[in-house]
């Protein structure tokens, strides 16, 4: 059993922290910007509530965070009352935020200078994956810290991979989002085409999902897409944040991402339709408007 802090109890962090407490059996202290959410978590799962990230992190073996973006991450780590000020030497900070590789490298350097380790460890699997404890975790950082943290991360994961040095976890998550963007647009166009052709979409998917076109998105989203229901997953506002990170990194490393850039604009169109909180499969709604 380890002593653990978790910073950020959103739709992902709330169940992830719960798995660390209930499945992992760890002592968990939580911090959330909206205190009422942390109070609810403690009432539901036990553990302790801390008023600041610094208070949460003090003396802990492992500190996790799952927050909104680079600025939020800097705030809970190196900002006023940030966790880095109180972390003990030899501890490991594991960040599950989808953020830039740049901020991951920056925080890795600051952690090393202070005598503890930093792992960038974004996740894939959405809210359902977090609730069921079956997330995929893509990790960047030192192997020693990874092996130390892996048994703890395992409480909410089904796949944990060390992808390389600091920033590599975030870069891998970018590839994940780039791939998903193209897959969903292709699926949306396929369903749209099938409807226009007068085909039974259920029968079509039953057949093509067993061939080369099959994907997680097809298996898990075609029914809701066909029914015009878009409240079953990752919100478009967050997907556009992620794709913005991908496109910024591509500008830095010289990668050409024409489809990703186009799909990002398609998501912008869906936002303008009032779909900011619709899930990513709502690309079909744009085609059917």
Feature roles, as predicted:
Residues 53-116:
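Rossmann-fold NAD(P) dinucleotide-binding segment
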Residues 4, 67, 93, 98-178:
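Rossmann-fold dinucleotide-binding core
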Residues 16-20, 107, 152, 193:
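Hydrophobic residues within alpha-helices
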């Amino acid at each position: 059993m380890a002593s653990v802090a978790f910073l950020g109890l959103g739709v992902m962090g709330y169940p992830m922290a719960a798995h660390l407490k209930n499945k992992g059996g760890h002592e968990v202290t939580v911090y959330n910007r909206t205190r009422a959410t942390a109070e609810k978590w403690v009432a539901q799962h036990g553990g302790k509530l801390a008023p600041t990230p610094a208070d949460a992190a003090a003396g802990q073996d492992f500190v996790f965070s799952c927050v909104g973006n680079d600025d939020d991450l800097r705030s809970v780590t190196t900002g006023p009352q940030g966790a880095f000020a109180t972390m003990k030497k030899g501890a490991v900070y594991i960040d599950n935020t989808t953020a830039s590789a740049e901020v991951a490298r920056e925080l890795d350097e600051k952690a090393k200078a202070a005598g503890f380790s930093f792992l960038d460890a974004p996740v894939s699997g959405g809210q359902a994956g977090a609730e069921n404890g079956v997330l995929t975790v893509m990790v960047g950082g030192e192997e020693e810290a990874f092996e130390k943290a892996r048994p703890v991360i395992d409480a909410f994961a089904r796949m944990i991979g060390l992808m390389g040095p600091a920033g590599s976890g975030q870069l891998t998550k970018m590839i994940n989002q780039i791939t998903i963007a193209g897959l969903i647009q292709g699926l949306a166009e396929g369903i749209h085409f099938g409807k226009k052709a007068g085909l039974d979409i259920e029968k079509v998917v039953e057949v093509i999902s067993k061939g080369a076109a099959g994907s997680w998105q097809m298996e898990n989203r075609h029914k809701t897409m066909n029914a015009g229901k878009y409240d079953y997953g990752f919100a478009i506002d967050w997907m556009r944040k992620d794709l913005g990170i991908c496109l910024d990194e591509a500008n830095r490393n010289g990668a050409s991402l024409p489809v990703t850039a186009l799909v990002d604009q398609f998501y912008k169109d869906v936002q303008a339709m009032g779909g900011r909180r619709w899930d990513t499969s709502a690309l079909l709604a744009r085609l059917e408007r």
